[in-house]
């Protein structure tokens, strides 16, 4: 796992420079990586969702905070960055490596890390050193609370296979929402 984290950090440094210097084309690059991560998440499924019905939980995804009708791109970037960082935190935790196929997990983490670099590069370009607005702070807090509930759920369920399956499906939904947000923002630009 330590090698995986070191590898991801090297990728972060290597991919940060082109993102900043080539300009921000976030909807195109991010959506491609997001779609690949979604596909990999489907492949990671180890249990039938039907066998884990008793473990299902509503984590309260902050849909209003990632709704393109209510959020501008400059506001969306910090929220999507936080969402991606939190997903990456879950999948790089020591307990996740025992739950998933190592090759698929590495691929998902690599894609998430590249997405995070894209988002952070755009954040630096668009926001610079400006402070976050109260709306952005509220949105970031909602995302953090959402992922805290997921982390607590995993801990309470002792990182059981069904708990991981529920979380995998929930993360798939969260990534799908971020893809929809970016698609709508991209349409607004055109």
From Swiss-Prot:
One Pfam family hit: Interferon
Regions that span the bilayer: none
Residues bearing carbohydrate: 101
Organism domain of life: Eukaryota
GO biological process: defense response to virus
Disulfide bonds: 24-122, 52-162
UniProt record similarity statement: Belongs to the alpha/beta interferon family.
Functional summary from the UniProt entry: Produced by macrophages, IFN-alpha have antiviral activities. Interferon stimulates the production of two enzymes: a protein kinase and an oligoadenylate synthetase.
Identification of the protein by name: Interferon alpha-7
Natural source organism: Mus musculus
């Amino acid at each position: 796992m330590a090698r995986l984290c070191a590898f991801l950090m090297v990728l972060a440094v290597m991919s940060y420079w082109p993102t900043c210097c080539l300009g921000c084309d976030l909807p195109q690059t991010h959506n491609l990586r997001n779609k690949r991560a979604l596909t990999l998440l489907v492949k990671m499924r180890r249990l039938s969702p039907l066998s884990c019905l008793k473990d299902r939980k509503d984590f309260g995804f902050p849909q209003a905070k990632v709704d393109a009708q209510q959020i501008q791109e400059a506001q969306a970037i910090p929220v999507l960055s936080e969402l991606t960082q939190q997903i990456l935190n879950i999948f790089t935790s020591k307990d996740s490596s025992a739950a998933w196929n190592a090759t698929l997990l590495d691929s998902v983490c690599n894609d998430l890390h590249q997405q995070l670099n894209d988002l952070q590069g755009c954040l630096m370009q668009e926001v610079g050193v400006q402070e976050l607005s109260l709306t952005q702070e509220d949105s970031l807090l909602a995302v953090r609370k959402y992922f805290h509930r997921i982390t607590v759920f995993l801990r309470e369920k002792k990182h059981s296979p069904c708990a991981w399956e529920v979380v995998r499906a929930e993360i798939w939904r969260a990534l799908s929402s971020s893809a929809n947000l970016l698609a709508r923002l991209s349409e607004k630009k055109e």
